[in-house]
Curated annotation (Swiss-Prot):
The gene is Prr16. It comes from the Eukaryota. Regulator of cell size that promotes cell size increase independently of mTOR and Hippo signaling pathways. Acts by stimulating the translation of specific mRNAs, including those encoding proteins affecting mitochondrial functions. Increases mitochondrial mass and respiration. Residues 1-22, 77-91 have a biased composition (Low complexity). Keywords: Coiled coil. One of its GO terms (biological process) is positive regulation of translation. It comes from Mus musculus (Mouse). The keyword Coiled coil applies. Residues 120-129, 275-289 have a biased composition (Pro residues). This is Protein Largen. The lineage of its organism: Eukaryota, Metazoa, Chordata, Craniata, Vertebrata.
């Protein structure tokens, strides 16, 4: 370009045209940019107007909350003075904070309701003292008034003095002659010895279906059917020492059985030395020969 301009002076005038054209193009582009900026400013003004409308709607909605006058005035001045997007955003945040602040403060009416609800509530100590007073007589009653029995107490509360039903349904028959002279014992010794024997050698106790023991008394001489199973009969008479055996079969006391509980909490027969046995004078002599005692056991033995 420089070589051509030096050789031909006419070409230099032609070369000065392109810079002038470029300047005009730049000016046109600047005008276009300014117009675009004006459009953007117009859009921003529209957005500001919309934000003001939103703020007015918020004020109308929050007017029912009875806001303080100072806070409402400050919010209005902030919204009117905001002219740019940054100021409008800050004013919106302030309005949100001011709208949330009065909600945290409790109004006057709910506080009055709370005070009314607190007054009728009774103090906690009185209801705690009432059960303690009720428990004291319950602890004193069993120790102060011991119940006298004949030494044969069942765990379910029944007495063996009169015909009583054992929990499994059988009836325990004991003659009344042995009850008057039997040793008396109170309930206070029961916790020490949980196993209480039954007085009287003649009694009938029926256990669960696996093991059955039948002792016959003078009033009950019937026999039970053991559901067609094998039965072992023990019919050997036992004579106490120092007595002459009678011609007819004599009664013998039931064998010593271990103490074991029934299914529903009762106690089995136990002839231990924990309770003194009744005196021999209290037992009336048999008037007539009676059938010999038999012990019926099933072939299937169980450990309790």
């Amino acid at each position: 370009m420089s070589a051509k301009s030096k050789g031909n002076p006419s070409s230099s005038s032609a070369a000065e045209g392109p810079p002038a054209a470029s300047k005009t193009k730049v000016k046109e582009q600047i005008k276009i940019i300014v117009e675009d900026l004006e459009l953007v400013l117009g859009d921003l003004k529209d957005v500001a107007k919309e934000l003001k409308e939103v703020v007015d709607q918020i004020d109308t909605l929050t007017s029912d909350l009875q806001l303080e006058d100072e806070m409402t005035d400050s919010s209005k001045t902030d919204t009117l003075n905001s002219s740019s997007s940054g100021t409008t955003a800050s004013s919106i945040e302030k309005i949100k904070e001011q709208a949330n602040a009065p909600l945290i403060k409790p109004p006057a009416h709910p506080s009055a309701i709370l005070t009314v609800l607190r007054k009728p509530n009774p103090p906690p100590p009185p209801p705690r003292l009432t059960p303690v007073r009720c428990e004291e007589p319950q602890r004193v009653v069993p120790t102060a008034n011991p119940v006298k029995t004949n030494g044969t107490l069942l765990r379910n509360g029944g007495l063996a003095g009169r015909p009583n039903k054992i929990p499994n349904g059988d009836i325990c028959c004991i003659p009344n002659s042995n009850l008057d002279k039997a040793p008396l014992q109170s309930l206070m010794h029961r916790p020490e010895k949980d196993r209480s024997p039954q007085a009287g050698p003649r009694e009938r106790v029926r256990f669960n279906e696996k093991v059955q023991y039948h002792g016959y008394c003078p009033d009950c001489e019937s026999r039970y059917n053991i559901k067609n199973r094998e039965v072992h009969l023990h019919s050997e008479p036992v004579h106490p020492p120092g007595k002459i055996p009678h011609q007819g079969p004599l009664l013998h006391p039931p064998p010593h059985l271990p103490n074991f509980p029934l299914e529903n909490g009762g106690l089995g027969i136990s002839h231990s030395n924990s309770f003194p046995p009744p005196t021999p004078a209290t037992v009336p002599p048999p008037a007539a020969p009676k059938p010999q005692k038999t012990i019926l056991r099933k072939s299937t033995t169980t450990t309790v």
